[in-house]
Amino acid sequence: MQNDRFTRIRWLFGEDGFSKLQSAKVLVCGAGGVGGMCVDALARSGVGSITLIDKDIFDVTNQNRQIYSENVGGIKVEEFAKIYPCITPMQTLITPEFVAGFDFSKFDVVIDAIDDIAAKIALANAVDPSKFIASMGGAKRVDPTKIKVACVWKTSVDPLARKYRYELKRSGFSGNFDVVFSVEEPICKPLGSFMGVTACFGLNLASLAVKKIVGQQV
């Protein structure tokens, strides 16, 4: 077998699994400390088509946790697209209004790595739950061993997840999907962040997405 950048992914999932990854269309909402790491892992794993949506540019304060943030002033989604040809960048603010007008049906997996609650609720209601994965709060924490994956209704401790569940119920949502969250109590009031946690959130999202694509039990 000829070695290439995806040789070890082929070894892991076999040619059939790798073919599914190459054919997959994934949407990642958010290119910050969580979403950026998720996208990087997906691209390195051979996902053939990734649409990445985020409005922001890289700021110096991103450099404690966000990959490729050395390019201060660069548009986040475009910086990722320069590195990975499989990425289609969309520099857009994700709002409930944007979600209402966007076609999610063409994607095999949709990943929510944004912070805005209203937009998160709109996403959850717009996407087929079997294709949806979401991140809860990764800031204010330092212990990656406290990160968990569970059904959205089974989260605990995380204040963002608590509010998210409340707003989901209020919106009339009754579906079920997996989320990544932490059972570590927040250790500060400002949005302090540590790459050891935010990166692990993103990698957990990528793992869930890859398993959905290749058909492994999640």
Where are these regions (language model features)?
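N-terminal charged helix/coil linker that caps or initiates catalytic domains
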Residues: 1-26
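Glycine-rich phosphate/adenylate-binding loop
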Residues: 2, 102-109, 114-122, 126-128, ...
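Conserved N-terminal Rossmann-fold NAD(P)-binding element of oxidoreductases
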Residues: 28-30, 53
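Hydrophobic/small residue at the entry helix of a nucleotide-binding pocket
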Residues: 34-35
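Conserved S-adenosyl-L-methionine
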Residues: 44-49, 129
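Glycine-rich phosphate-binding loop and adjoining beta1-alpha1-beta2 segment
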Residues: 52-83
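Conserved SAM/SAH-binding loop
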Residues: 91-99
